[in-house]
Amino acid sequence: MPVFKAPFNGYSVKFSPFYESRLAVATAQNFGILGNGRIHVLELAPGAPGVTESVSYDTADAVYDVCWSESHDSVLIAAIGDGSVKIYDTALPPPSNPIRSFQEHAREVQSVDYNPTRRDSFLTSSWDDTVKLWAMDRPASVRTFKEHAYCVYQAVWNPKHGDVFASASGDCTLRIWDVREPGSTMIIPAHDFEILSCDWNKYDDCILATSSVDKTVKVWDVRSYRVPLAVLNGHGYAVRKVKFSPHRRSLIASCSYDMSVCLWDYMVEDALVGRYDHHTEFAVGIDMSVLVEGLMASTGWDELVYVWQQGMDPRAS
């Protein structure tokens, strides 16, 4: 399976929604504590195990997350450790990038998510305890959402409702928001420890998953959220990212500081259906391809990016 070695520690990996062979990777020097960052755009070789870098962009601070535009196939957005949000166009020569840079967050930007239904806006979340809404044609953020009492590690759009998003915070709450409303519409005390990630089910717009420092992944139904639908135990340390499959309703991927990537089917009794122990440092980034069913990617502090098919060994050549 394809493996890419980056010079810095991996933080995030995202498949392109337009090209099945293209990925973007966010990396940071010195584990994101101090130093530069780099964004890599990778291409999978058709019918071969190789992966090549088509372009890279250096940043003066760590890159914690990256996402692709849902409306322009060459555009990606990066969340930077200096509080900035930068937009890149891979169709332009590297010296022309970034094409835009926004400096509004007061602390590190932890996540960025492009609206999959409206296709003209995106969210960022930050260690400054806020979530910001941005429009591609605006010179500044459209709105700032300030309710969380601690770092907002991730904010993600609902896949079916273009005005609804969820945010996961170190204040131990999961919040549901509608951008048409003045405040959050729902507050779920989802874990007793910091919540590091959240994601919506791609087939049921009322179901979402959270992951936490408490080593669990939990599945929630916003129509009845006093008790989780499922609690998934199996990781040995904090669960850094959680991601619902775009192809199978009940399939969830997660990655952890225990260096593993796990696959779960939350609707069956023995929920842990796959475990991959290919990373040798914290596994912190995971994605599943929308265009190729079963294709997964992960990255971690071991500076490696793996791309593999579910059920295969990520390290197999």
Swiss-Prot record:
The keyword Cytoplasm applies. Pfam families: Beta-prop_EIPR1 (PF23609), WD40 (PF00400). Disruption phenotype: No visible phenotype, but reduced sensitivity to indole-3-butyric acid (IBA) and inefficient peroxisomal import of PTS2-containing proteins. Keywords: Cytoplasm, Peroxisome, Peroxisome biogenesis, Protein transport, Receptor, Repeat, Transport, WD repeat. The keyword Repeat applies. GO terms for cellular component: Cul4-RING E3 ubiquitin ligase complex; cytosol; peroxisomal matrix. It comes from the Eukaryota. One of its GO terms (molecular function) is peroxisome matrix targeting signal-2 binding. SMART domains: WD40. One of its GO terms (biological process) is protein targeting to peroxisome. PROSITE patterns: WD_REPEATS_1, WD_REPEATS_2, WD_REPEATS_REGION. WD repeats lie at residues 58-98, 104-144, 147-187, 190-230, 234-274, 278-317. Interacts with PEX5; interaction only takes place when PEX7 is associated with cargo proteins. Interacts with PEX13 (via N-terminus) and PEX12 (via C-terminus), but not with PEX14. Belongs to the WD repeat peroxin-7 family. The WD40 repeats are involved in the binding of PTS2-containing proteins. The binding of a cargo to PEX7 is necessary but not sufficient for the targeting of the complex to the peroxisome. PEX12, PEX13 and PEX14 play a critical role in this targeting. PEX7 is required for PEX5 stability in light-grown seedlings. This is Peroxisome biogenesis protein 7.
